[in-house]
Amino acid sequence: PIELHGGNQRLLNPAIDKQTIRVQLGRRTCTVCERESPYLRCHHRALDAHGEAKAGETCGGRTQAKETKSNAYRRGEVQSVRMDEMVEDARIRLGIDRLPAQVKCTKKLNSRDQTPEAIEKGILRARHSLPVFRDGTVRYDMSDVPITHFRPREIGVPWKKLHGLGYTHDYRGRPLEDDEQTLEIFPQDFIVAKGAADFLLRTAKYIDELLVRFYKMEPYYNADKADDLIGHLICALAPHTSGGVLSRIIGWADCSGGYAHPLFHAAKRRNCDGDEDAIMLLMDGLLNFSRDILPANRGGQMDAPLVLTTRLNPTEVDKEALNVDSAWFYERDFYEATLQQPHPKDIQNRMDFVERRLGSVAAVRGYGFTHDCFAIDRGPALSAYKTLETMIDKMNGQLALGHRLRGVNVRQVASSVVRSHFLPDLRGNLNAYGRQKVRCLKCAHSYRRMPLSGTCIQPKKETGRGLSSMGVAKAEGGLCNGNLALTVSEGAVRKYIEVMRFVMDHYGVDLYTRQNADWLASSADSLFNNDRAKQLSLSDFL
């Protein structure tokens, strides 16, 4: 953490220029030199026999947390950190010539003990241009796509390599000898989006460099190209959950989605209706994830792999995945029964669902399919919602499709979109604009009400040598005086008004929806537009 010493971009170099900074960190004591250090390993420079310290040679002893503020929400205390010496020691220990141009830091730690991550990890991540999640891991998001069968050609992996991963026979039981044979995917195998190949490769190189330079161990991945990651383990994690699922990379798909078994997606608590989940290299999670750096506020334990499911159990997943049809064909009496339009439960005994296979190997193997395809990734690489730029283009695309479908009433679709999307968004943005805070562009302090001075009135904290380096505010004067900015802009409120009027004028909506939309639009106009009041004299009324 560097507070405001790194500027708006929270960069490490500006904080180094200030040499000593004042930040809130947990208090720990070294068991070797008995000096205080916020890190798990003492960062102070070791002294030789003559009492002199040398750059790059640190104590490195284990530290123990001090018993302070045991009942506090966050147990850290404000203390001084010599940034220039600490970063220089880290650079020398890593054996690199210079720091990356941009090393991102955080303003403050939200964890309970406020124990910082080793600064060497942030430096190495910046060398490979990798982002970091709040739990210390590097993740890549992709849409969930279910799959049961594939061909080696479709995932860009030779059949001989898949043979070494356990795919010895195709779905008909014949030995695997060709790239065109159809294979049934194992429940915990994963086909990654090709766009993630370079990202995962950079992550693997970062992990290897971390093992060699920081942990003084042998590299693990030794990956020179993306195909070298085939067969390595990953951890898949869905948002708003705290349990990862173990998986294995077996290939690449030319799309923006990740292909996996339906039971695998269900184990992540997902049903493949457009959700996006994250994957991370397993070694990254084992090395860098820590509960000690998770936020202590509400929801801080979510989106973190607190537990890892190593073996998928079909009886423990959501029932929605157990309703997957796994038959090879539909019998004649099924088609005849559909003529009477019965309730699905009345004919479910005629269907081969996964639920009926529980308790046997057939629950995870031997799934069937009724239609084959040439390539699993032959569909659109990106959805139209991403390729179409403006919201008007997106609405035209949706309603143009409604014109082609006889069972769709375009006017009802337009009314539904306006009622369920545009109007609630406009109403919520109007409320947010009226209740917003103002934020200082200099020190990032926020106010519920605008100060009468029109500028930031927080005491200014000088940095440098002496007492000022401790962040001591001046006794008199010395206010921040930074410019204040709104946190909710006019554009955020009015962004859908033009689109909403376009939909109502071109496709038509019911009268109630139009009146509601006009009323909210006029409310926005009265909030932002100047009424241009004129000063009148008495003669104007004669």
Q: Across the structure, where does each feature detected by a protein language model lie?
A:
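Conserved core architecture of multi-subunit DNA-directed RNA polymerases
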Residues: P1-L542
